Amino acid sequence: QLGAVHQLGVQIPPTMITNDPEDVRRFAQSHARVIFKPVYGGAHTRDLGPAHLAPHRLELALQLAPITLQAYIPGTNVRSYVLGNAVYTAEIRSASLDFREDSHAVVLPMALPADVQEQCLAIARTLFLTWTAIDWRLTPWGEYVFLEANPSPMFLHFERQTGFPITQDLVHLLMQ
């Protein structure tokens, strides 16, 4: 995803996917703050801390599966749902690194700049996704940084908080 999206000219965070402990250490030293998550699966995003870099723990964890490391991007969580040619976007106010852990997260509808809305549609087309949820970080400097496009996103909570007609649009797409 990241490579294909980056080729569209969309900004992405510095990223490494690896199961080599030395690569993890070098990446951690190269960035002030690093987050990690599984390459595949729904496990939540975590901050990479000194305990994770302990040699035995790191080697044991990386024997099981590679991880995705990313430089932490300061800012606000933004999620855009793309359903065909419709794009619905909201800011997610949460104190948690991974908003899925925060039962008190507040979801507020927001307007995307036209160029970012076009990027959403281009990302969905490039990844062959008729419908998707795209996660962004909106930096304090006003830049949108792509994090991922989820091909099978949960949406009911989001729909209830925003009033966006996601279910209706999804049913319409499936009926076509």
Predicted regions and their residues:
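Phosphate-binding site of ATP-dependent enzymes
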Residues: E22, Q29-I123
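Protein kinase-like catalytic core scaffold
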Residues: V34, Y88, T132, V145-L147
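C-terminal active-site "lid" helix and adjoining low-complexity regulatory extension at the edge
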Residues: A111, R125, L129, L138-Q176
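Short acidic-hydrophobic, aromatic-tinged amphipathic segments that line or gate anion-handling sites
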Residues: P14-N19, G49
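Conserved N-proximal alpha/beta basic substrate-recognition cap immediately N-terminal to
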Residues: Q1-I12
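PAS/PAS-like sensory domains
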Residues: I67, L129-T132
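Hydrophobic residue at the +6 position relative to the catalytic HRD Asp in the kinase catalytic loop
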Residues: I134-W136
